[in-house]
Swiss-Prot record:
Subcellular location as annotated: Cytoplasm
GO CC aspect terms: cytoplasm; Holliday junction helicase complex; Holliday junction resolvase complex
Keyword Cell inner membrane: no
Protein family (similarity comment): Belongs to the RuvA family.
GO biological process: DNA recombination; DNA repair
A molecular function (GO) term: four-way junction DNA binding
Phylogenetic lineage: Bacteria, Bacillati, Chloroflexota, Dehalococcoidia, Dehalococcoidales
Protein name: Holliday junction branch migration complex subunit RuvA
Length: 194
């Protein structure tokens, strides 16, 4: 129904933004990183939107890119995943990392997202692995393999999000055969060098 909004960014919070389009302010719920990425207050912005209609509410979900919107709409097609959980998933990991985890069948990484258990992660992979186009693989994707999932677990236990941890792991050079402690130190260096 409303596929995008183009207007002035009037206000924003952690996971929402108000976009003024010709005098009407539309509150859009967004992944946690999106309000800061779309622009500064008072600037003209454009967001791609999904209107979710419920019996008691109309909720507008906004995204900085069409790819994010597409992934969101694909996620909420999975049984048991509503728009709030879909948004939480895109808040925990960027779209590329999330698509990569689904394509590679990495249920362990998916289950680190708050609200996604092992069963839900398995259902997501089962239902979406073939639906998500291979165009996601053309970009720079973050692959977390079983060989370095222990680093992922350590970094998330230290308070980093699954997306941040996956980026740190992806930045590592050849780490095969390296002791776990060394691999963790190298991953932590990623955050020190940011």
């Amino acid at each position: 129904m409303i596929s995008s909004l183009s207007g002035i960014l009037e206000a924003s919070g952690k996971d929402w933004a108000v976009i003024n389009v010709s005098g009407v302010g539309f509150r859009t719920y967004m992944p946690a990183s999106s309000p800061a990425l779309i622009g500064e207050l008072g600037q003209r912005v454009r967001v791609f939107t999904h209107l979710h209609v419920r019996e008691d509410a109309l909720n507008l979900f906004g995204f900085g890119t069409a790819e994010e919107l597409s992934l969101f709409e694909t996620l909420i097609d999975v049984s048991g995943i509503g728009p709030k959980l879909g948004l939480a998933m895109l808040s925990a990991m960027n779209a590329e990392a999330l698509a990569s985890a689904i394509i590679s069948g990495n249920t362990e990484l998916l289950s680190t997202i708050p609200g996604v258990g092992k069963k839900t992660a398995s259902r997501i992979v089962l239902e979406l692995k073939d639906k998500i186009t291979k165009s996601w693989e053309a970009g720079v994707l973050i692959q977390v393999t079983e060989a370095n999932s222990d680093i992922l677990a350590t970094l998330t236990a230290l308070g980093y999000s699954a997306g941040e941890a996956a980026k740190a792991i992806a930045s590592l050079e050849d780490i095969t055969g390296m002791p776990l402690e060394e691999r963790i130190k190298l991953a932590l260096n990623y955050f020190n060098n940011k």
